[in-house]
């Protein structure tokens, strides 16, 4: 079948094309195919030609052929769609009024709930109902109150006194600005100079708990304000801040020069001024600090004999294993002071408090005749006591 006998190719239809496709056919970028090409695609499809063969013979992309045929089978039209057009307007005045009415009745109503209600009340159908994003945009632009309008007086009672003070202090705009926080809330704030002066006074009167509000030489100079120190002392203090925090080998081995003696004397004179400033910055007084810190506490001295005779509650007295000897008398004499050491052999008190109750916290076990029968228990091994007291 010869398709190009009575039908011109797209190359001869238009001039000034935008490009050439993969099949060698020309096209104008962004514009639809001519109606004659569309009609020829439909005619070939009616003749039973496959879409891939139509695409190859007419030099039109396969996607374009499929799209044109699909639209023709659905609608019966070969006309192209609207290029650059928009959807029909769904936010009609009636729909906007209904959305505003729903929002006034229930301010916490979601956009999807408004959309479902519009469909339920037959205000819109499935084709004309606005989307959720469109409803949110309508509420934001047409239903809600614009920000430049004053807030009703009834909403002022919600704001507490503390929050009003904080909001007015945070706002840096002028009092007449409608876009500031004070302008939106209808709060008349004082002038900027008054706020700045109050902020400066608040910095001086309320330091942070550790006594240092802002580090650095500039802030320290601002706090001094030339009242506590002379100009010479301020220069010395500046040199101290400029000096390195860690001394190197040259500064540690270098002797003090004569011209540095005046500097050190001036630094010594800073002690009084720094003490006064620290007393003003710190919140508690030195007397309160001294009273809160406990003084030195005395602890009783435990001698060697008392330590040996002391046993922890719930534990048996210490018995060294067999074969381990005790300290001799000369050794104990060197370890214990003479006033505490009597010279008698080191012995342990009798085992009068030693029983089986410390090993068995459950009293029911002690009631068994097995633990109290001499045959079952047997005699205590005397080797431990003999090794303990043999000296």
Curated annotation (Swiss-Prot):
Known tissue expression: Expressed in all B-lymphoid organs, in the embryonic midbrain and in adult testis.
Gene Ontology cellular component list: nucleoplasm; nucleus; transcription regulator complex
Intracellular or extracellular location(s): Nucleus
Main localisation: nucleus
Assigned keywords, A-Z: Developmental protein, Differentiation, DNA-binding, Glycoprotein, Neurogenesis, Nucleus, Paired box, Spermatogenesis, Transcription, Transcription regulation
Disulfide bonds: none
Residues covered by region (Disordered): 182-218
Annotated Pfam families: PAX, Pax2_C
Region (RED subdomain): 94-142
UniProt cross-references to InterPro entries, sorted A to Z: Homeodomain-like_sf, PAIRED_DNA-bd_dom, Paired_dom, Pax2_C, PAX_fam, WH-like_DNA-bd_sf
UniProt PTM: O-glycosylated. Phosphorylated by SYK. This phosphorylation plays an important role in the abolition of BLIMP1 repression by PAX5 in order to trigger plasma cell differentiation.
GO function term, MF aspect, one: DNA binding
DNA-binding region of this protein: 16-142
Region (PAI subdomain): 19-75
CDD domains in UniProt: PAX
GO annotation, biological process: adult behavior; animal organ morphogenesis; cerebral cortex development; dopaminergic neuron differentiation; embryonic cranial skeleton morphogenesis; lateral ventricle development; negative regulation of DNA-templated transcription; negative regulation of transcription by RNA polymerase II
Traits of the deletion mutant: Mutant mice fail to produce small pre-B, B, and plasma cells and therefore lack any immunoglobulin in their serum owing to a complete arrest of B-cell development at an early stage.
PANTHER family cross-referenced by the UniProt entry: PAIRED BOX PROTEIN PAX-5, PAIRED BOX PROTEIN PAX-6-RELATED-RELATED
Role of this protein: Transcription factor that plays an essential role in commitment of lymphoid progenitors to the B-lymphocyte lineage. Fulfills a dual role by repressing B-lineage inappropriate genes and simultaneously activating B-lineage-specific genes. In turn, regulates cell adhesion and migration, induces V(H)-to-D(H)J(H) recombination, facilitates pre-B-cell receptor signaling and promotes development to the mature B-cell stage. Repression of the cohesin-release factor WAPL causes global changes of the chromosomal architecture in pro-B cells to facilitate the generation of a diverse antibody repertoire.
Subunit architecture: Interacts with ETS1; this interaction alters PAX5 DNA-binding properties. Binds DNA as a monomer. Interacts with TBP; this interaction allows PAX5 to interact with the basal transcription machinery. Interacts with RB1. Interacts with TLE4. Interacts with DAXX.
Protein name, as recorded: Paired box protein Pax-5
Naturally occurring in which organism (per UniProt): Mus musculus (Mouse)
């Amino acid at each position: 079948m010869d398709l190009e006998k009575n039908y011109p190719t797209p190359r001869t239809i238009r001039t000034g094309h935008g490009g050439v496709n993969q099949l060698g056919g020309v096209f104008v970028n962004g514009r639809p195919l001519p109606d004659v090409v569309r009609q020829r695609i439909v005619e070939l499809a009616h003749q039973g030609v496959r879409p891939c063969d139509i695409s190859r013979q007419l030099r039109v992309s396969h996607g374009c052929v499929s799209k044109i045929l699909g639209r023709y089978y659905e609608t019966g039209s070969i006309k192209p769609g609207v290029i650059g057009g928009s959807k029909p307007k769904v936010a009609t005045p009636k729909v906007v009024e209904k959305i505003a009415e729903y929002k006034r009745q229930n301010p916490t109503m979601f956009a999807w709930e408004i959309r479902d209600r519009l469909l339920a009340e037959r205000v819109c159908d499935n084709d004309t109902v606005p989307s959720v994003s469109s409803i949110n945009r309508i509420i934001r632009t047409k239903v809600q109150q614009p920000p430049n309008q004053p807030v009703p007086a009834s909403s002022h009672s919600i704001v507490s006194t503390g929050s009003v003070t904080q909001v007015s202090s945070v706002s840096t705009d002028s009092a007449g600005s409608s876009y500031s926080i004070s302008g939106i809330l209808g709060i008349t704030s004082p002038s900027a100079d008054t706020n700045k002066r109050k902020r400066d006074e608040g910095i001086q009167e309320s330091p942070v708990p550790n006594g240092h509000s802002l580090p650095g030489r500039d802030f320290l100079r601002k706090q001094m304000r030339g009242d506590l120190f002379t100009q010479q002392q301020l220069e010395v203090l500046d040199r101290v801040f400029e000096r390195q925090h860690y001394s190197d080998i040259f500064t540690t081995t270098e002797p003090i020069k004569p011209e540095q003696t005046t500097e050190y004397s001036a630094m010594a004179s800073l002690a009084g001024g720094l003490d006064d400033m620290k007393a003003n910055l710190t919140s508690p007084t030195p007397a309160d600090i001294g009273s809160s810190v406990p003084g030195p506490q005395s602890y009783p001295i435990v001698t060697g004999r008392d330590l040996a005779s002391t046993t922890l509650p719930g534990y048996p007295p210490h018995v060294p294993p067999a074969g381990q000897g005790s300290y001799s008398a000369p050794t104990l004499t060197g370890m214990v002071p003479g006033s505490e050491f009597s010279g008698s052999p080191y012995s342990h008190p009798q085992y009068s408090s030693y029983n089986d109750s410390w090993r068995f916290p459950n009293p029911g076990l002690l009631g068994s005749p097995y633990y109290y029968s001499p045959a079952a228990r047997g005699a205590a091994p005397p080797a431990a006591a003999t090794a303990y007291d043999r000296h």
